[in-house]
């Protein structure tokens, strides 16, 4: 887990890099910037600990995280589907915190999320991946039905 870095609006340069702030909207994207000194890689999860406390998003492109955001780096092979599965679980735990409490890094490290496990008691990454693949397919099929008249 890594804390994001402060970047004031005055120091932002317009560009194509995502700037992830403490927002509950648009995957946390609050600006597109040219600044690239503190970019985090794709395939990570962002968690707001100030402002929109607990808002959690999977990031599929590199980005700059504001200083109100913590970035979670996986210690396992995290696919996009696994990231999309885990993000709402983290968000659920974060609901216990508010703007006044904040979800500081030291507190966040002590919190626990519950994951599905396999017969050996290890996280069932395969299940999480296939579950989200089905959710995405079902959602896509559902939306396609609205486009057919």
Ranges and model annotations:
Residues 1-25, 118-149:
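Non-catalytic DNA-recognition/assembly elements of restriction-modification systems
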Residues 11-12, 38-39, 104-106:
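Intrinsically disordered, low-complexity regulatory regions enriched in Ser/Pro/Gly/Thr
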Residues 19, 49, 57, 71, ...:
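General detector of folded, globular domains
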Residues 25-26, 52:
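Short, glycine-/Ser/Thr-/acidic-enriched flexible segments
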Residues 31-87:
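A short beta-sheet element
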Residues 68, 86-118, 142, 146-147:
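Glycine-anchored helix-breaking recognition loops at helix->coil/strand junctions
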Residues 75-78, 117-121:
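A generic structural motif
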């Amino acid at each position: 887990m890594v804390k994001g870095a402060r970047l004031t609006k005055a120091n932002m340069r317009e560009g194509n890099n995502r700037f992830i702030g403490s927002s509950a909207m648009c995957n946390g994207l609050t600006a597109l910037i040219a600044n690239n000194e503190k970019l985090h890689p794709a395939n990570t999860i962002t968690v707001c600990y100030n402002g929109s406390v607990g808002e959690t998003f999977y990031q599929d492109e590199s980005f700059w995280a504001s200083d109100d955001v913590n970035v979670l780096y996986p210690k396992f092979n995290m696919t996009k589907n696994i990231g999309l599965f885990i993000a709402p679980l983290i968000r659920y735990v974060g609901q216990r915190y508010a703007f006044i409490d904040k979800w500081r890094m030291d507190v966040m490290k002590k919190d626990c999320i519950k994951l599905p496990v396999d017969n050996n008691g290890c996280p069932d990454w395969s299940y999480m991946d296939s579950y989200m693949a089905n959710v995405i397919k079902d959602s896509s099929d559902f939306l396609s039905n609205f486009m057919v008249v």
